């Protein structure tokens, strides 16, 4: 089976690769504006905007940890957050766990590569291992697909947004999910970050 983008005259090996290409800035306008103070960037999807916040590159200085806290507080019915992965705070309110900051040293060298002490993944450079340790790779998966027969868990909101926007399990078809995603957008726009 050949998957083909006729506009670009390119073939793709899988449906997901073609779908990702069709949803990229090559074919879609960057019309999702960042509401962050001092930021004038635009993105092709809400997932890309969320990733912008999570990466800490927005001039507003929004971090992944702050974003998680805002979403957990807004998702009072735990529609997209998993209460089993959250901590119970004052007055019974759920809070996302505070990420643990970890750094690897030269002692992570196993003779042929730098090895992550949590998952055994290897890296050619120590800086790459430390980037891995600072990423959400080992954080709790506090987000979940709201579709009952899917329930895939995600460590980042951007991962959940990509899952929903990509239509991987059909969850985007449900009005309630569209309402939640639109609510996230309104919430971002209401932020004074």
Which functions belong to the PLM regions below?
Residues 1-193:
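Alpha-helical interaction/linker modules in multidomain eukaryotic proteins
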